[in-house]
Amino acid sequence: MDIESDHEPKESSVDLEGRHDSIRKSFEADDIDVTDENTIFSTSRKEQSTIEPMDSFVENNIANSSSQQSVSEIDIQLPSSEPKEGVKEESNLIESNSLDNVQEINPQNTIGDKSAHTEEESSNDNLVKITAGTIISDIMDEPVVDEDDKLSEEDLSKEDLETTLKGDENYSSSQKEIYDNDETIPKPPSPEVEKIETSTSVENAYITNSQYNDTLDMEDQTSDLITTFEHENEDHEVHEVPSIHGMEGTFETVNLTSEAGNEKEFNNDSVVLNTTPKEMQISSLDAVDKLEDKPVSNDNIKANIESSTTVDRASSQLESENNESTFFVHNQNSSGQHQTLDFVASKPVTDTPELSKENTLVSSENLNDPKPNLPETEVDFGEPLEVEAPSFVVQNNSAVQPTTQKTSEDSTDLHTNEIPNVAQPPSSFEKENNKDTSKLENPDISSSPLSPTEDLFPNDPEEENLFSAALGLNSNTGSQPSETQSKPSIDPSESITVTDNQDSLLFSQLTNNALQAENATKVSENTINDEELIDDSEFTSLMSNFLESSTVQTNKYLPKSSASPPANAPIVSSDVHKNENAGTARRAPQSGAFVASKAKYSSPYDLPEEIVQVAQQKRSVSQNYNRQYSFQPRPATPSNPPRSLPPPSGQVNAPMSQTPNPISFAYQHGTPLATPTMRANSFNSYPASSAEPIRRPATTTVGHTPNLYSPKTNTYNSRHMAYEMTKSHINVISPGPSLQVNAPYTPTSGELGNKVSNPTKEFVSTSSYAPAANTRNAIIREPGILSPLSPRVQPVLSRRESIISMGSSASSYVPLEIAPRPMSSLEHTMNSAMSPGNLQRTANLYKPMTTPNAYNIKNSNQRETKYPYQPQAINYSEVTQPGSSSLPTSGEEANIIRSPGFTPLAAQKDATIYTPSHAQATLYGNMDNNDRDNEGIHDILQSDMEPVLPPHNSAYHANAPVSSHSEGLNNRLPISPLPPQLHKTGTPSHQHGFDTAETTAKQYAPSIPPNFNPNVSIDTMTEGVALPSATLDSDKSSLHKRSAELSRNNSPRPDFLPLPNQPLLHSNLHSPVSPVVDSNEDSRLKFLSTQRPAFSFGPCGTIVMAFSTPSGLYTTSGKGTKFIAGPIKIEKLGDVLTDEYRHLKEFKGPYLASNGKVDKHGKAEAIEWLSKYIDRLNQSLEYDDKNITLKDKLLLLQCLKMLLEVSDRKLIVEKLRPILLPSFEIPEPCNTATSVQELINPEINQDDSPIVASRYCTTSFLHRFYEYLLSGNKDEALTYALQQKQWPYAIIVAHSIDAKTFQGVVRTFCKSEVKESMLRSGVGVNLQLSLQLMSDAHASSMSEFSSSTSLLNLADQSQASNALVAWKELLYNIIANHYSDQKEALRVLGTLLLQENRVYAAHLVYILSLSPDVCSNKSNSLFELVGLSKHNLYPSHDDLFDVTQLTEVLELVFNVYSEKTPVFFTHLVPYRLYEAEVLAEAGEVSAARKYCELIGNYLNRVAKKSNNVDPGFVLRVRDLTQQILENSAGSEDISSSWLGRTVSRPRLDTVLSSLGSKFSKFVAGDPNFDVMRPATVGPGPFGKVASQKNLTVQTNTNNAAMESFYSDRPTSSGPSYQNRTPLTGQESMNMGVYSPYRRSTEIAENMSMDGNAYPYTPASQENPYTPRHSQEDNASVLSQQPLTFYSNVADNSYMPVSASQEPKMGMGTAFNMPTNEVHGVGAEMASPYQPLQPASAHLPNLQPTLAPINQNAYVPSNIAPAMGAMQSAPSAEAVAAPSESLNLNKDRSQQAKQAAAQNVADLVRQEEEKEKQKQKAKKNAESGKKGGAKGWFSKLLRRDESKDQPTVYKAKLGEKSHLHYDKELKRWVNDDGSDLSNQAAPPPPPPMALPKAGPPSAAPTSALPPAGPPAGATAISGNPGMPAPVPLTGKETAVPLSSMPNAPPSVASNAKLPPASNNRKVDPLEDILQAMPPPTTRKARGKTSKRYVDVMRNS
């Protein structure tokens, strides 16, 4: 028993050495074997137990009887060995197990002063009768033992062995409880003993013994007490010493002494006490009867809140002559362990059968089992014996064998069919023969084997029968032979055993359903009946003994054999294996045992019906029994309790029926403990082997009841609790001189005293919740004692105590009274995540003055302000010693030095560790430890904790504050902290991911800066000019020498010290600036002569490098050298680029071939590129490991690489797990071969984790639920099930109603039962989402997918304290389980991540859906480029290039997983062009060429299906391709290019020299190019598409308001010089390769009526890209035109809103005035807002002014139909003739008929001539073939003679237009005989040009350009994509354009025109015939059908 006090128990000085032999002889004389071990007391260290004589056992105070139902508590005051006034002995927890309704009672007992009792007190006659079955728990104090009162061996006599239980007025007795009050247990005839009934409303009922004067007589019996001490040291030695006869009620203290004579300490080792109690008699039951007859008075009720002793007293109805008493003393020490001392007192029995003494050791954790039957023994309570508190329950359980006689018929009916409501004690204890103890399950009790001994205390046969009846043994068990060997067991699940034959027979019948009625009679009489077996005993006994063939079962309650077993380790039997991943223990299937595989049994209830029914009955009994205690909520405990705490007794695979309260731990462990020793460091979260703090007595705190199973978090409400209440067994490490262990801060001698004891060995509790501590060591500290009066402030710490471990991290369970050391941000993150209560106290963080590598602590006190100190190099690979510093590794804090009076700064969010510059190193470098060890750093101010810049010096920092460091001025100004310094690996020192020993780095102090030079005065320093000292060099004229000295002083490192591998980067301090003149002339010359890039030109990476040439120069100082411009050299840019552009060369894109399919090497190249990219990101994370964006990007790249490597959808889940969840381990699968025991009774595998939902299903619920269903009301049944939280029934009913109801019930279940607070961060939300997704709920309807929930609450960026860390778990959960709404769930999750600006993470979620639709430029797409938000329209150049490459990789991924057609991102084509341009500029011509090939082939495919091709984009691709081909002419072949394949003309420069001119013509153009008639179709594949030349009519007057708005304007395909204008001030829109879009107002603005010589021709609506007509390039200067701010074209997307709106009222009259009035022009301009009128109403007779159309121009077919007035400009016919001239007159004039006949005759003649030419050419071709074949080059060079002839054109006048001249009729008639005179002519096509007046001319009318829009329409801006503007009406008096001044001469002055006459009508047919163009005279150019691609073919 544990006695906790502030003083150590006084040990007796009696030496046992001299009395050893004599006592052993006395034992041998009495025929007592000292090795006979009947009772074993296994003790643990530092716990004291005493066994007092019986006369003082009930001597003091039997009171405090309290019960709520049937539990009694008795306080027993016992004498103390060292009485002290005012000392309160802390009582121990006493728990007793009652099989009836057991409640939890937490009274407290106050044990007052005790004094030695005299013999007069012991002679009182007040005796108390204690019947058999009484269970008493007490606390026995140590009696006073004086040296004079110690008895000698001669004083020991049998008469003194008489012990009496004395009573006085203070004595009290508790109410007793009948042990077996159930009717199922047969009770032999015996006097009835009534129970003492107490009111349950009274919490504490005290029944004093003063009301009764009953005596309990004890007969005079002699007893020999054999005490054997087993001292289990580290070597497991066992020392046996003889026991001592206790005389006169005393025992002497025993000190063990080994053979070597060294005294052993009991507090560090386990001591086992073996006693053999003798018979002890307790007199008659009269006193008990009288005691029970007395009523309970309320006057005797006391309230004692300090009682902690619980005594349960249960008496069974046994015969009075056979009654026995058993005292259970349950002790629960500070470790939470339970110890029980059992003393059995019985009346002596003269005739008893032989019993085999077996010492059964019961685990202290099994306290819920009822008290097993014990044999009758007599115990002599003699002298108290000081022993260690036992850690195991000691029971003298002899394997009682019942008599071989059959019981009488009266006692045969021991079992009934009624299922009892309470459990019975264990059924039997089998006899075991002599076996080797090494084979037992508990070899640790004794290292020597147990020898068989003779039974000294045989039982009486009648008592045997009584035991059998009380225990409910089967009547057939007596028939078992005595030779049956069975291991003794107290396990209730193993209390019943049968033979193998019986087991096999019964099980064979049960499992095969072959239990026939006719076979029942054949079962032998000894066969155990199934109904008898399945009774109140646990059903697991049937499974263990019947269904498993193994006869020898290991005991679950015995610890496994180990070399050094832990004192309180959780006990697991050998047949139970621990599943570490799953955290549950499972029973291993026995060999040959019956198992039910999943293939055979889909459910446990598919087993034989007999087994299932019995199991259901048994489980129902267990639930009814345990439901009584369900009102006590189970405390919220960690999922894995701390290892230092013993597991709850209900956990150890015990049957639930044997567990009083398996739900509530408070019943078993809720009674307050004795106040344990409190240590200053409270809860130690480090491994037990790493720290050994000092143990200090705790200050008793009243009124607090600690919860053993709550986490050790010392919150404000629990700050008074005893901190260390548990102990654990660890491997003790003795501290050596250099030993360093982890330990947190503790208050020390500043306030609590200066004397601190040396550290000693002690066990340190461990917790499974504690973070894994680093293996590195720290300095051992001496923790102080916490005083309740101490203020809760930062304690004063000495320097030695402030040195912190490098490997330790701050505990998350530090109490509030203790101020911890400053924690890093990483530790804050860990603490916030691991603390259950999220306890975050504001840590006093401060920044150290420097990192450890800037100074040496050993030289830390002596400082100089004038001359800086240069410390020696520090090798960090050395072992860190106390007092020295160490380089911190990842997640660690640097060594911190404090002064006694230092006050930490305010808390900072991020406490970074930095490396100072050389200036700080010189400031703090000279530090000596001569005085610092004693006084600390008292001379360092608070400003020293911040980095300091040196004083003002232009060589260091131009803007630094002015200060001085000379003598007398020691002020230093703090500035912002410096960034971390880089080591040789480029990684900051505080973020090393590897051990510092592997990267040995040395740092040297810098040289003396000029500002620390003592020769520099203060005035000079304040002036900001650092001049060299006069003492450096007396020669003032030597500039080189002076500059050299100054440069050397200003250098950051001295010349004699080695430089690091990498310079210091990322420093705020500027490097010293040396003078311009350097002393090193050679280096200067080398620098000046180095080549430098001069300029770069072209898109293909051509760069010009310039060189400097030195030349002699004579100056006043002598000869010098000057550099002049030297030669230049043209090189490739890719050859001179630095490593910064290596990513341009590494990317081997595009990964798609030119045909759009995946390239065969693309996949391997992409994986290689991703691998290099991932390595670069990992290096970047070493610099900044908190960059969330980089981490998300790294995950994205890893997933892309994985998707390319796997290429199989089925393997994605498996390969994705290590990327998203690297630390996750898959739990072991469920056991496929589950035993029947586990299937039917799963309670045996219950865990100790917190219960989230516990609801029992009652019979009333089932009846009412069934009634609802019987009435057909499923809704009411569902509602009732939801109200009662019967989720299985509710979910089943909801599933039968509809899908929405089912989803709602599942959602309700998740909200109610899945407690987020009980689970790890993020698990609750993810589990809720998973369950709802399984119910086919829509992801967008879940409230968990909301930014307001804890799923993505990113207000706090701390990852550990936020549930955002679980988004990867949720992502993997969605992908791994393949939910039906998986894509929608991924979309919603990605949207939430985008809301929090987690772009890479969101895109990763989208990509894992493997749907190409997520990436496009459509409005409903999720993103357009990987890593770029869809709304981010302005990325940088580097970001755009990077995201384009990532998107290309994604395109390749989708192609790999595409099952049908290839995936091609059309929106990526413009970005690919940008990428090609960047690569071409960098010199990567081949990569750029691949992109151009891919884009060109895509455009060729698209142009065949759609006409929505941007001409500007086409020009950019064409120009870039041509330039790439020209730059790669020596190595590339144009025929392999997409551009070469579209051009029919091959490369001819390498064939024949005669073809050089042809090649020049191909490159430079046609030398015969007609400037007056330029070809509108240029070379190239897109010549016909972009054939319109630029409209360069433009002046230098620009509209600032519309500067940024451009219109979609195609440009010409001809040379760029053709589009240039010689006008000064004009803007050329086609000066470069590609011209941007032109402003929509540039066409119409600045164009006056005078200069409207080149009007704008809009495109048609059907084809917005209709080629437009060209105009003269040498146009004259145009006059100004008023600016128009508005337009009636409202749908022009390239115009601002103001330009497409009508003018408001009051805007001024200038907008509505005619143009001629504003500018003084006589012509009046029509208003653009007048109603629409016919074109003839306002258009003048304009002369043709446009350039002639090319007859070979390509005209699409969709513009052939006549254009209406709303679609195109008015035709020349409408301009030339009025509308009435269109009326055809049937009476044609003769002149018109003659003209038509002449035209037809000409056509016929031309056809005949053409036929003749064809025949002639055919003959020539035949003669050429006969002469010999020629090559294909000759065909190219051959000129066709027919081409020189004029081309004959056929006119199709209609279907019936074949005319012939009828001589009779003398006119032309049709072949079908139709009369032409009576037919109306078809509507003619619009003529090209028709002047109104002018003399006839022979020039063809085809030379006239088409008429443009009217003058009023010139102000309207045209758009290729919009319909043509509506022509505006004007007056007839408009001035003709030809009459305007400054108009260019008309090119149609010689055109043939019909005679002008206003008096006659013009025949339209005559106009048509006259408009026929003559044969062209232009030189033929040959076939051009293969020179271009008809992109408008299908349009």
From Swiss-Prot:
- GO CC annotations, alphabetized: COPII vesicle coat; cytoplasm; endoplasmic reticulum exit site; endoplasmic reticulum membrane; ER to Golgi transport vesicle membrane
Entry keywords, A to Z: Autophagy, Endoplasmic reticulum, ER-Golgi transport, Membrane, Phosphoprotein, Protein transport, Transport
Basic and acidic residues composition bias: which ranges? Answer: 1-28, 82-91, 153-169, 407-416, 429-442, 1033-1045, 1804-1825, 1852-1870
User: Do you know which InterPro entries this protein is assigned to?
Assistant: Sec16_CCD, Sec16_Sec23-bd
Q: Its Gene Ontology biological processes?
A: autophagy; Golgi organization; intracellular protein transport; protein localization to endoplasmic reticulum exit site; vesicle coating
Bias (Low complexity) ranges? 561-574, 1899-1915
**Where in this protein does the record say Phosphoserine is found?**
790
Residues annotated as region Disordered? 1-32, 61-127, 140-198, 349-378, 392-496, 557-594, 629-661, 945-994, 1029-1063, 1605-1631, 1649-1675, 1777-1995
Q: Where is the composition biased (Acidic residues)?
A: 140-152
Q: Where is the composition biased (Pro residues)?
A: 635-649, 1881-1898
Q: What ranges does the record list as Polar residues composition bias?
A: 61-72, 93-112, 358-367, 393-406, 473-496, 650-661, 1609-1629
| Membrane topology note | Peripheral membrane protein
Cellular compartments annotated: Endoplasmic reticulum membrane
Q: Which domain of life is it from?
A: Eukaryota
This molecule's function is given as: Involved in the initiation of assembly of the COPII coat required for the formation of transport vesicles from the endoplasmic reticulum (ER) and the selection of cargo molecules. Also involved in autophagy.
Q: Which family does it belong to?
A: Belongs to the SEC16 family.
Q: How does it assemble?
A: Interacts with dil1.
This protein's name: COPII coat assembly protein sec16
